[in-house]
Amino acid sequence: MSSSSETRRLRVGVDVGGTNTDGVVLDPSRASEPDRGIIAWHKAPTTTNPSLGINDAITTMFQSANIEPDHVASVTIGTTHFVNAVVERDVARLSKVAVLRLCGPFSKHIPPCIDWPEDMREIILGHYALLKGGLEVDGSLISDVDEGEIREQCAIIRDKGIRSVVINGVFSPIDTAERQEERAADIIRAAIPGCDVVCSKDVANLGFLERENAAILNASILLFARKTIRSFQEPIRKLGLHCPVFITQNDGTILSGDMAAKLPIRTFSSGPTNSMRGAAFLMQNQLDEDIMVVDIGGTTTDVGLLLANGFPRQQAAYSDLAGIRMNFSCPDIKSIGLGGGSIVRDGESMTVGPDSVGYKLTQEAVVFGGKTLTATDCTSLADQGVQIGNRKLVEGALSEEGIAKFKSIVKRKLEKVIDTMKTSPEDVPVLLVGGGAVIAPDELQGASKVLKPRWSGVANAIGAATARVSAVVDTVKSTEAKMTKELLDETSQEAIEKTIAAGASKESVKVVEMDTLPLTYIENKTRFIVRAAGDFDFSRTDLSTTLIEEAGAEAEQKMDEYEKSGKSNTTRRHNELVEDIDIEAYKPSVKNRVWYISETDLEWISIGCYILGTGGGGSPYSGTIRLREALRKGAVVRVVSPADVPDDAAVGCGGGAGSPTVGIEKLAGDEMLDAQRELYKVCPTPATHMIAIEIGGYNGLQSMIIGASSEMDLPVVDGDWMGRAYPTKWQTTPVVYAERAVIWAPVAVADGGGNVLVMPRASSDRQVERIVRAALAQMGSSVAVADAPVTGAECRRWAVEHTISQSWRIGRAVARARRDNRVDGVAETILAECGGAEAGRVLWKGKVVGVERTLRMGHVYGELVVEGADVVDHDDQQQQQQPEAVTSSSSSSGDRKPKFRGLLKIPFKNENLAAIRISRSKDADGKIVEKEEEVLGLVPDLVSVIDAQNGEAIGTPEYRYGLLVIVLGITASDRWTSERGIEIGGPKGFGMDHLTYKPLGKFVKPTSVIDEFDVSV
């Protein structure tokens, strides 16, 4: 029997946590009333079979408020089951995974899970193999998949008893023609019937390692997720509810059950997201500032920043879960193993968590007659006002000293995680929600006030009930007859319509994410990805009520096999157990003017390299973990000052050339050493030292990789030929000095796939570039280049000095800003390491609202558009340094907060070329007309875009809609500011003859780490 839309108005939200199952029924039409329209709520321990808890919650609420099933418009279920399995490292719920890479000869130095915490790698990674396959960036084949090779691996996987397989192909997200991952999946399913196969392209986008990581986690949780979601849906059918059933996903929107069963990773952050959305619902009309939401459950505490607009703060370009780096957007949530069910171990060194009794709290906690001392027991013992269970049962379990120690540990854990999530040192309001909030103290350092609103214990269920609707359009369109922007607008409208069709109200839908990926191997074709979101339309009665795989007995899932295994390793190497390095006390190892690189040095240098890369040069991340592994295996990397290089030294050079987009997707093989070996077959003088071609990006580390004792074993010069990153070989300081007719010949080029190009001589450096670039287009748009050595005397005259030191100092500045929770001032901290106010300034702060890219002859061309956002700088002096055209003063007396308003355009050719403030208006025909208002920064000065959430650089391949960014301008080295230097590396070198270079400030030479820290013996 159907009901009218007026009758069917109620929304049911259920959140199945690791400890409690919470439910709420609310009437959204009464949301503004004092009771927020909450008709009924329920909290009960989570059962091993979640269907029993869901059934109990809904039945109890329906009975208490006399609710009929036909009154319900939707049921939305959220869960922390999956993320808890990962956080707890529960081997009973995490399946072993086999990883098959379709990569040909590439990525061999960076195997799967190399950057994972050691314990997670041991639990999940069961097998991996590097197989034929993969695409180049232009869609051509690295190699085709080999069915026989895949079948051989299937036999090994089958013998190991592994039932989950991940396929990760190079450039698979743009593979619309070869369908390599899909073809491999078909072969695997035929060879291993009944196994789960995850194609990486279905999980995340470009970014080989990060996509692979996400796919592996997704595969590991797949079996458990499928059975769990079926168990969620079963009680809905039994209760006679004929309404849509949704699962909440990471961004606070809803997902159909069948999609959630295939991509459970999209729900990993749904629990804390629900709590934050629920908090926003409870605090509506009271939220006029950012609030830190602390959701304390039975197993974990999840902390996130709820912005004044009611939405959670999003993570940076890369996300992190349990120490695993991924590349899909989700709320910026920090989870720690602390909850009401956390196990307390008393002793000389008391521990609280991270393991938990979870949903068995009412059976195993001492206050309920159990034998396991939990955080709830200790809280009951410490506070007589807490009425939970039988307090007498826990008396004597801890001494007064033990109680004080417990309270101190809990307080310290909460304060630390709150501190970590802050971006400024100012106190922020803290909102406590969740069933475990009872263990939290009433006061916390760093909190301006601690709030606990009514119904906060079921905020997660409220968030589920009020979850939004979203939809994605991912399509390829022809750009032959229409401009990219016009097609993007069309795709956005399609996404809006799809979101409305999925159940959103028309007036609430907005585009929340968009991306364009030119498919240059298909002429005039571009891939458009647009996501829109909106509020649920309660008047809809036409939405599907189908549940996934209603397979009778199979749907009656036995969940007993997922009882807490007890095998999670509490002595594991876990991020929260690792002591932070004392940044101020740390001193690099410099002995007799030789700097021996450590892991800490490498991390800081890597951060600095990417910032100096001005958007290009490729991400140093893969090079960082490759070199880190070499250091851990005993390799030695030596850095020396240019001043200490003998006149007759032979300073060699090597690095990558090509598109930075390729660098994050096609990981290196042996091409760098191949090129060096081929060079010295035609070059009579062997290198005695190495120097980086460019400090910016991936190439900033290449001299250290090549020079490591495990490779060529050569000292590395603290400098480079650019002081940044540039897209061409002739845009280097040796060419600026022009002391030789040709610098860059002989030269050797290798693509890692067996192809080598050697030029013993050339007519000019520009000709070297043209020939290498022409070959590059046929060699995968990314190659390794080995350059003939120069003399030590030439090196001292030409090199931009101390740029490894500069990178190290920039990285240290970012690390310090994070430690001090001054990420809001990280830009100024970076500038201080680059010479201070006279050497650079903050050009812009805001949100990315537009990205356009195209690929031509191995270069990525495009532009980034950033919409200005109001910015508060705490340093009055820094306020005075902002360009007048960018800032404006408030009319109120004494209010001098700078404002970034309007639009900033950053054109790029691999690297950012300029920062230009623009205005847009419509002409008489309604077409948008763009006007350049002011050039704020221009090559050869550095224009760097950094992530406002963590202070790290964002490269041109990572630009995407919605990112919050800071744009830095840093004055170029004086090696570039001569007339010839500006001609080569300035606007004219990029065809921007209409622009005139005006230096941002005065160049300040970087301070040498070797000079500062040397200990001579």
Predicted regions and their residues:
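N-terminally biased helix-coil "hinge/interface" segments that flank
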Residues: 2-611, 617-674, 696-702, 721-722, ...
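ATP/nucleoside-binding phosphotransfer catalytic cores, i.e., glycine-rich phosphate-binding loops
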Residues: 836-876, 883-1017
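Conserved nucleotide-sugar donor-interacting segment of glycosyltransferase catalytic cores
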Residues: 713-716
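Short acidic, glycine/Ser/Thr-rich loop/turn "cap" segments at secondary-structure junctions
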Residues: 213-215, 686-691
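Short, surface-exposed loop and linker segments with low hydrophobicity and enrichment for Pro/Ser/Thr
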Residues: 271, 521-523, 690, 955-960
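Internal, conserved structured core segments that host functional sites
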Residues: 692-710
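Helix-rich "cap/lid" substructures immediately adjacent to catalytic or cofactor-binding pockets
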Residues: 673-684
